[in-house]
């Protein structure tokens, strides 16, 4: 199931990329490659900061009632399904955070580094095999911390 809607372009460059040919992209050019298409990127969830566990549970339960999804408790947060994460004690970001799912974190990190977005290495979370399943960017955008995530 696709969780986002992409606009498919029909330019020759895009078609060549889709056929598996290697293509380069620089921060100063517009090309058919974008992270949504290249990394099957979509919004995994929105994070909301609560001041304590009771408030977090109440907020998550409201989203659960709104969307008919289960409330799932994790050590740092409550989830309403997989769409909304409510942090128990003021998580990252002034206003909260946005998690973007990608299919290849190392490649996505390289892509975004080429555009001047730095990774906060202290935020990196690893799978037992040593691969990354979550990492934040250093800077917020409009008060939101941004992280990349992959399936564990």
Positions of predicted regions on the chain:
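Vicinal oxygen chelate
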Residues: 14-18, 24-39, 66-74, 83-87, ...
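Mid-chain, well-packed structural core segment of small domains
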Residues: 94-122
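Short, intrinsically disordered low-complexity segments
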Residues: 78-97
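N-terminal beta-strand motif that seeds the catalytic metal site of vicinal oxygen chelate
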Residues: 15, 23-60, 93-100, 152
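Amphipathic alpha-helical segments
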Residues: 52-67, 108-116
